[in-house]
């Protein structure tokens, strides 16, 4: 009983007393591990899984044009719900997502109870949710601000890469 009272869980905000919410299970014939962490994910890309895998330059020839044509906030929301369901079923409790419409992604993370970082993707060229790198950075800043006090969900600015962002854009994203 004293142990149950002392049981605590760490959160982004500090220590939260959690003793009464835990359920004791019989794990004698099982392996118990902590929740897994996915540190590189594109939750909204579920509809494109496996498509264009045979393309030589899959990103530029297939994915970017497909995303610009087909991806919108509602598709990102539905895809994210599906992807988080898969993550939770496989033992992932924390995810770093880097994609588009991350304000929608962050909301779904919150609704589904996963711990996550929703990172707005930044590229030089236009994408399905931003006209340019500056707009994407502004979206990321707004997301960081909106979730700065949330116990499980955080916002971030996530530059796509060195081949899709200039050195100046990378510096702006860092700042």
Residue ranges and their predicted role:
Residues 23-25, 37, 117:
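Hydrophobic/aromatic beta-strand patches that form the interior of the parallel beta-sheet core
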Residues 7, 11, 52, 84, ...:
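Structural signal for hydrophobic packing residues in well-ordered secondary-structure cores
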Residues 28, 44, 53-101, 161-169:
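Divalent metal-binding segments
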Residues 47-78, 112-137:
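Active-site gating loops and adjacent loop-to-helix segments of metal-dependent hydrolytic enzymes
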Residues 35-46:
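Histidine-centered catalytic micro-motifs
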Residues 104-175:
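Metal-coordinating catalytic core of metallo-dependent amide/deamination hydrolases
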Residues 29, 40, 91, 109, ...:
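Divalent metal-coordination and catalytic microenvironments
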Residues 1-33:
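Histidine-rich, glycine-flanked metal-binding segment
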